[in-house]
């Protein structure tokens, strides 16, 4: 699990992207 891993939540935050592991809306 690295910073640039787009399949992890931390990777999403580092890359500034969203997806299954990092939804835009807060539940």
Swiss-Prot record:
- Which terms does the record give in the GO molecular function aspect? rRNA binding
Signal peptide range: none
- Keyword match Calcium: no
Give one Pfam hit by family name.
Answer: Thx
Location of region: Disordered: 1-27
GO-annotated cellular components: ribonucleoprotein complex; ribosome
Keywords from UniProt, A to Z, are: Ribonucleoprotein, Ribosomal protein, RNA-binding, rRNA-binding
Mark out the compositionally biased spans (Basic residues).
1-13
InterPro entries named among the record's database cross-references: Ribosomal_bTHX (IPR031414), Ribosomal_bTHX/bTHXc/bTHXm (IPR030826)
- State the function annotated in the UniProt record: Binds at the top of the head of the 30S subunit. It stabilizes a number of different RNA elements and thus is important for subunit structure.
Family to which the UniProt record says this protein belongs: Belongs to the bacterial ribosomal protein bTHX family.
Whom does it interact with, and what assembly results?
A: Part of the 30S ribosomal subunit.
What is the protein name for this chain?
A: Small ribosomal subunit protein bTHX
Species in which this protein is naturally found:
Thermus thermophilus (strain ATCC 27634 / DSM 579 / HB8)
